[in-house]
Swiss-Prot record:
Name of the gene this protein is made from: asnS
Protein name per the record: Asparagine--tRNA ligase
Keywords, ordered alphabetically: Aminoacyl-tRNA synthetase, ATP-binding, Cytoplasm, Ligase, Nucleotide-binding, Protein biosynthesis
Enzyme class label: ligase
Family of this protein: Belongs to the class-II aminoacyl-tRNA synthetase family.
Domain of life: Bacteria
Assigned GO CC terms: cytoplasm
Compartment(s) where it occurs, according to its Swiss-Prot or TrEMBL record: Cytoplasm
Subunit structure: Homodimer.
Gene Ontology biological process: asparaginyl-tRNA aminoacylation
GO MF terms held by the record: asparagine-tRNA ligase activity; ATP binding; catalytic activity, acting on a protein; nucleic acid binding; transferase activity
Alphabetized Gene3D superfamilies for the sequence: Bira Bifunctional Protein, Domain 2, Nucleic acid-binding proteins
Length: 430
């Protein structure tokens, strides 16, 4: 009977065949231990010399790392294993033998591993990170579908930038200029006027020359837009979403979190409502903590965000930033018109901002004024202005960076490990 490593638990004391790769092996004179993986998990195969043909034991000792095999044997309980079971191997069939696999069981430098990212993905820890990434995506669809959101796919090639920045990748679109999308927000706002609540999940591109452990040039973003929604209601949706994702990973990725040696007690504390601190109060807090490199009207850097998040040891919303450091489309704060109705959600443990969101300007005259103040081409944003001409309503939205969120939940040090093939400032291969 052919099965997988994950399903093998359903076949205790039965003979099964598993297609797998050999990740590692060790042997003594009379027994060989094969570390097997098949994409669904990792399992040990035990080959006892006295219980198999001589050629099977010889093969078990000699087969090279990452060779592909069909391994047949009996599934038995093993309480020492993370899985709780192993295979007593009876026969081995080589599908394809590997030669001189470059990532041996010794330590390798980061650049070497990134050069061999196509192979590094096979390692136990990298496999665990990708499984957690997959669970975050699965839980995302579950949350939005259950809450009545419609998925909309905004274009990747755009004629204008939602953020109004210069950090864009430019390309030619026949005889026109086009840019790789930094965000699907403006298109999602249009879709929200048709469907009420919408979300998207797709790649975004930032031509930022950043080399920090938090930044990727290409990353995936989950964005939501909601009509007839105010800022306070939006924050509630955001914290419910993040809490749902964290709980889903805790429930469905126990083994992966164990492999990564993640301190899950920090994740278990994540619950609604999240702490909130205004930008004004955050500045005062930082001053009291001895930070003299930040003044009102300036954006926070990584050390500032870390200090604020560590104070709460939970995800924390920083609300109502100064108007001048935020994009043109954010709604003024009625209690202080020098600030806007926005929030960044900062993850604890130094992982930084994972969500940025705001209430959107819904008044046509104000939005036209903002477009001019930011030096933007009004014609390029005419479709966006139309949304305020024809039945404008209060509405809000937010965007969550997938890779940064996965880094926080999985506890990996650098965001590059959370993308299958990360694009960094100096890396376009593989």
């Amino acid at each position: 009977m052919k099965t997988t490593i994950k399903q093998a638990k359903d076949h205790l004391n039965q003979d099964v065949t598993i297609g797998a790769w050999l990740t590692n092996k060790r042997s003594s004179g009379k027994i060989a231990f094969l570390q097997l993986r098949d994409g669904t998990g990792f399992m040990q195969g035990v080959v006892v010399k006295s219980e198999v043909d001589e050629e099977v034991f010889k093969l078990a000792k000699e087969i090279a790392q990452e060779s592909s095999l069909y391994v047949t044997g009996t599934i038995t309980e093993d309480n020492r294993s993370d899985l709780g079971y192993e295979m007593q191997v009876k026969s081995i069939e080589v599908i394809s033998e590997a030669h001189d696999y470059p990532i041996t069981p010794k330590n390798h430098g980061t650049e070497f591993l990134m050069d061999h990212r196509h192979l590094w993905l096979r390692s136990k820890k990298q496999h665990a990170v990708m499984k957690i990434r997959n669970e975050v995506i699965r839980a995302t669809y579950e949350f939005f579908n259950k809450d009545g959101f419609t998925k909309v796919d905004p274009p990747i090639l755009t004629a204008s930038a939602p953020e109004g920045t210069s950090e864009l990748f430019h390309t030619k679109y026949f005889d026109q200029d086009a840019f790789l999308s930094q965000s699907g927000q403006l298109y999602l706002e249009a879709a929200a006027m048709a469907h009420g609540k919408v979300f998207s999940f797709g790649p975004t591109f930032r031509a930022e020359k950043s080399k920090t452990r938090r930044h990727l040039i290409e990353f995936w973003m989950i964005e939501g837009e909601m009509a007839f929604t105010n800022h306070a209601e939006s924050l509630e949706i955001q914290e419910q979403y993040v809490t749902h994702v964290v709980k889903s990973v805790l429930e469905n990725c126990k083994l992966e979190l164990k492999i990564l040696e993640r301190d899950t007690s920090k994740l278990e504390k994540v619950a609604t409502p999240f702490p909130r601190i205004s930008y004004d109060d955050a500045i005062e807090f930082l001053k009291a903590e001895g930070f003299d490199d930040i003044e009102w009207g300036e954006d926070f850097g990584a050390p500032h965000e870390t200090a604020i998040a560590n104070h709460y040891d939970l995800p924390v919303f920083i609300t109502n930033y100064p108007t001048k450091i935020k994009p043109f489309y954010m709604q003024p704060n009625p209690e202080n018109e020098e600030t806007v109705l926005c929030a960044d959600l900062i993850a604890p443990e130094g992982y930084g901002e994972i969500i940025g969101g705001s209430e959107r300007v819904d008044d046509l005259e104000l939005l036209e004024q903002r477009v001019k103040e930011h030096g933007l081409d009004e014609e390029a944003y005419s479709y966006y202005l139309d949304l305020r001409r024809y039945g404008s309503v209060p509405h809000c939205g937010f965007g969550l960076g997938l890779e940064r969120t996965v880094a926080w939940i999985s506890g990996v040090e650098h965001v590059r490990e959370t993308a299958p093939f990360p694009r960094l400032l100096n890396r376009l291969y593989p």
